């Protein structure tokens, strides 16, 4: 879960730089824009930009190539709904999103590849941030691991919300995990 889009971008950039081969399903296109501009250092990343007409073909391609990958990032659940016309029934889209993520997770389990689905917290409710209803139901009830990423001073902080072997509330701080760090690293090598 993310409240800050820049923190989400920096965290996913950090992950893609630490894994050998990443499949990145970029629904909000932010990662792709920064990647194409040369701001991100990654090892090998295959970026998929789904659209309504290509969703089935893209899903098949992703599922087939997951065996050669080390991580799949599905970014961002909230942007999934923007792929379809406004008149499309929400229940149908929620079901399609659920099936898509479950296919990715099942295939990930079969080939031992973790799947990270990102979601932005969308609106304030009584002083706190709340996920949109559809992504909340899907991610909060189906996720094996729940993380929250935000800033701690000028560093990226990952907080464990739920994990089978790490205590909830534990915080990992990534010092200097901003895009400027990745950009300078890229030009030094």
Indicate residue ranges for each PLM-predicted region.
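Conserved beta-strand segments of the P-loop GTPase G domain that flank and frequently precede/overlap
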Residues: 25-26, 47-50, 75, 116-120, ...
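Conserved nucleotide-binding/hydrolysis micro-motifs of P-loop NTPases
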Residues: 28-32, 51-55, 78-79, 121-125, ...
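Phosphate-binding/switch region of NTP-binding enzymes
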Residues: 109-189
